[in-house]
């Protein structure tokens, strides 16, 4: 089984909670025997779709842009059995880098209009891979992912194998929460293993990955607000805060 794991976080490894959770999941996939390639999209040149439809007319199936998407990423996407779309939650949906990647898969479809089950679709030129969506957010409520979930279900339909949404994700990197973080990451690895073995992730495993961490919202909010006030007063970004105070 060939799996492409895309990480659209702009943050470097070790800082990115998207990467931390994805790394654990990929570990399980590899234990299950999958051939997994991880790609940090922040290191790739992927231009915006310009809506020219060259990929539908002049060069069917090939984008007008000669960039990393056309030369490398799109062919790998087409060759994959499963693609994991790992993105931080920005303004309640995928971040801009992931959205650009998704838009650039347009050459896999043809321009014509078909209606299936009451919905209009473009016919598939090249069958897209199955999808898994992984996202993390700072807010503690799972409800913050509702818009993203609606979007990816519309986008991938029956090709969506699993959705993994981790609220209060900053906590998994804090030493005081390491016992809970270990359980979450162990479950993420189990989810990767299950995906390879059965093309799905059990509800029990997803519940373990996404289990509530925050038991006292006021304490959680006070901790977060104290952190941000210190950053503002000291004139530090979060990464600079970490380097200074550990």
Predicted regions and their residues:
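Short, glycine-/small-residue-rich phosphate/pyrophosphate-handling segment
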Residues: 97, 110-161
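A short acidic, helix-capping loop that chelates divalent metal ions and anchors anionic groups
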Residues: 170-175
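N-terminal beta1-alpha1-beta2 submodule of the flavodoxin-like/Rossmannoid cofactor-binding fold
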Residues: 1-110, 182-246
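Post-His helix in hydrolase/transferase enzymes
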Residues: 177-180
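Cofactor-binding loop segments of dinucleotide-utilizing enzymes, especially the Rossmann-like FAD-
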Residues: 8, 41, 135-138, 166
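Beta-strand-loop-alpha "switch" segments that mediate conformational coupling across diverse proteins
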Residues: 161-168
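A generic structural signal for alpha->beta connector loops
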Residues: 33-35, 128, 168
């Amino acid at each position: 089984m060939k799996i492409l794991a895309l990480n659209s976080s702009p943050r470097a490894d070790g800082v990115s909670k998207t990467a931390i959770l994805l790394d654990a999941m990929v570990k399980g996939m590899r234990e299950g025997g999958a051939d997994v390639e991880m790609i940090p999209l922040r290191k790739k040149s992927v231009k915006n779709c310009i809506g020219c439809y060259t990929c539908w007319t002049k060069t069917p199936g090939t984008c007008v842009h000669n960039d990393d998407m056309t030369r490398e990423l799109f062919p790998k996407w087409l060759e994959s059995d499963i693609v994991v779309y790992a993105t931080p939650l920005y303004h309640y949906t995928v971040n801009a880098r992931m959205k650009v990647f998704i838009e650039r898969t347009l050459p896999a479809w043809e321009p014509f209009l078909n209606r299936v089950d009451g919905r209009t679709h473009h016919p598939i030129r090249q069958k897209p891979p199955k999808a898994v969506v992984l996202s993390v957010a700072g807010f503690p409520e799972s409800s913050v992912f509702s818009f993203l979930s609606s979007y990816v279900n519309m986008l991938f339909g029956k090709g969506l194998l699993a959705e993994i949404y981790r609220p209060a994700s900053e906590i998994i990197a804090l030493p005081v929460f390491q016992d809970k973080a270990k359980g979450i990451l162990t479950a993420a690895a189990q989810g990767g293993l299950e995906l390879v073995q059965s093309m799905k992730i059990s509800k029990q495993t997803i519940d373990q990955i996404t289990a509530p961490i925050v038991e006292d919202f006021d304490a959680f909010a006070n901790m977060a607000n104290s952190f941000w006030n210190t950053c503002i007063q000291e004139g530090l970004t979060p990464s600079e805060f970490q380097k200074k105070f550990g």
